[in-house]
Amino acid sequence: PTALTLAHNNDSYAQEIHHYFHRKSFRVYYSNDFIGVQLAGAMKNVIAIAVGVSDGLGFGANARAALITRGLKEMQKLGSAFSAKEKTFMGLTGLGDLLLTATDNQSRNRRFGLALGEGISSVDAINKIGQVVEGRFNAEQICSLGKKKQIELPICHIVSQIIAEKITATDAVNFLLDRPATYE
């Protein structure tokens, strides 16, 4: 079985369409948070790359959980700046898809991050995967949106730097760990 979210800014239309697809083993939920669904869908790719990098460097479950949790916080912060609904980021579109994409070895974004964490160049990692890695493109776009809204997105920023080969994966970890502690 699987589940997904269908987003449309017209509630009645989304409700109507969802009935065409919704089945016992294919659960379709609907949302009118069109912006939140789009942002969550793009940002989870970037966070999944970060988690892959961490795992590629040999870090364990604690680092993975921290990146997923703090990454979700970045998703919520940017979403809030664009008037997205917080509940979108706590549902299938946000947390659900983030958990799947960041932890499943079938995920292209996770595998890309794993390769980067193992020291493979961006180009070689893409060639190794042989498929489109959306997070590769999403990272810079997300950083631009954050900058436009004056929102600090350290995980997204560092992932874009690793992809552009402006910083090594090891230096990226040090950058994140050297940041001052903040109130959660």
Residues of each region from the PLM?
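Internal alpha-helical scaffold of NAD(P)-dependent oxidoreductase catalytic cores
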Residues: 1-88
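NAD(P)-dependent Rossmann-like dehydrogenase/reductase catalytic/cofactor-binding core
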Residues: 31, 44, 51-55, 59, ...
